Amino acid sequence: MRSEKSLTLAAPGEVRGPEGEQQDAGDFPEAGGGGGCCSSERLVINISGLRFETQLRTLSLFPDTLLGDPGRRVRFFDPLRNEYFFDRNRPSFDAILYYYQSGGRLRRPVNVPLDIFLEEIRFYQLGDEALAAFREDEGCLPEGGEDEKPLPSQPFQRQVWLLFEYPESSGPARGIAIVSVLVILISIVIFCLETLPQFRVDGRGGNNGGVSRVSPVSRGSQEEEEDEDDSYTFHHGITPGEMGTGGSSSLSTLGGSFFTDPFFLVETLCIVWFTFELLVRFSACPSKPAFFRNIMNIIDLVAIFPYFITLGTELVQQQEQQPASGGGGQNGQQAMSLAILRVIRLVRVFRIFKLSRHSKGLQILGKTLQASMRELGLLIFFLFIGVILFSSAVYFAEADDDDSLFPSIPDAFWWAVVTMTTVGYGDMYPMTVGGKIVGSLCAIAGVLTIALPVPVIVSNFNYFYHRETEQEEQGQYTHVTCGQPAPDLRATDNGLGKPDFPEANRERRPSYLPTPHRAYAEKRMLTEV
């Protein structure tokens, strides 16, 4: 049975036992790193003035943590008070201590913000596994380099990478970002303007020596009906079917008109900038595989490849020789080529997503959708069930009506979708009493179906929005960890002696590092790989 010693404080820097003999702090079992201590021995932990008392065997359950490892926690030991002192967040320590008492259950107190509690977890060194489990319980995305910005090792590549990838890094980088945004906007405007009737290449009335443009003058209904035809008339009224007899002069004329078109020239300048930017960023990126895994870089590739496909198609059409016969086959081949080109050029609209590289709002929206994929999947699944159910119900409810607008269940899918989403397009509607009842139930079910997952999506958006705001605010402050003595404490073989404790001098107080202060730093921490 262990006999407890009654200790009395004497002069600063010395501790006396029951017989009055002088003892060093290294004579205490706990202060000496736990050597020879009983597993049921208790110790006191002082968190910013709030004292906690627990057993050593409770902390020893996790020996790889700050409190569980005697060698790590010993530098916070105060021999004058015979306790450990931490100048940390007090409400968070309730959950930290419960982590040891419960054998690994980590729960954040409701009155502690998430970022503060994450900082406390890292300070007490609970480990990456506990941190990952806690983030998963909190609904956070796993950490994996999202806030860590890798940089190339070469100085020149590092400067180029910062210049084109991080607009906030310098003034020239902001200038390049502004130029990139302007080029993106010009490309989108050109994509929209070239579809106007005043500028659209129509190919009718080709008496001007090439492909004519649509006149802005109003035309009669008969000519408007003819405009809906997909046939094209080229140089001097030559139709696509007559190209075989007309030689390649019409194609040359078309090619010359295509390559001298103002829209094509502006588009070419935009593509030159996009290609230059992509190649520079690829040559300076720190990791080539990670470069192609980035969704933004994939969008950049998708934004420029339709131009080169269209350009290659036009060049091939100019160089190939048309046969003297088989005009019908050429007509069908050209119609197929035009259809493919329309689909390819439609991909140009995805250039608008390039703006998300320079917009925090679009990035937050993308992260919200990524984090809400499960809720969005449930929403689509519920809508699918509702569409099948109510389209079948309205079809059979309207089956006896001769004027029914629902000839089949697949035809009623459209009505069910616009009704459940509360759009109410109005092109299809029930006429019978039973059909109207089904329509009412469909609208109510649609409101409930859409309303259920929306709060989760809004919650994710708020989380990412506040996290982005907090990161911007944290970029303006530098946090200095408090509670660690400034000089390095070195443990002796027999424990901790008086020379190892600066608090055992006449000042009676440890020399702590300064409190958190404001530092006007705008940049985030960038790690070099």
UniProtKB/Swiss-Prot annotation:
Annotated region Disordered: where? 1-33, 210-233, 488-513
In Swiss-Prot or TrEMBL terms, this protein is called: Potassium voltage-gated channel subfamily A member 6
The way this protein sits in the membrane is described as: Multi-pass membrane protein
Classification via Gene3D superfamilies: 1.10.287.70, Potassium Channel Kv1.1, Chain A, Voltage-gated potassium channels. Chain C
The species is Homo sapiens
S-palmitoyl cysteine lipid sites: 285
Membrane-spanning ranges: 172-193, 263-284, 296-316, 338-358, 374-395, 437-465
Which family would the database say this protein is a member of? Answer: Belongs to the potassium channel family. A (Shaker) (TC 1.A.1.2) subfamily. Kv1.6/KCNA6 sub-subfamily.
Q: Which InterPro entries match?
A: BTB/POZ_dom, Ion_trans_dom, K_chnl_volt-dep_Kv, K_chnl_volt-dep_Kv1, KCNA6, KCNA6_BTB_POZ, SKP1/BTB/POZ_sf, T1-type_BTB
Cytoplasmic-side segments: 1-171, 285-295, 359-373, 466-529
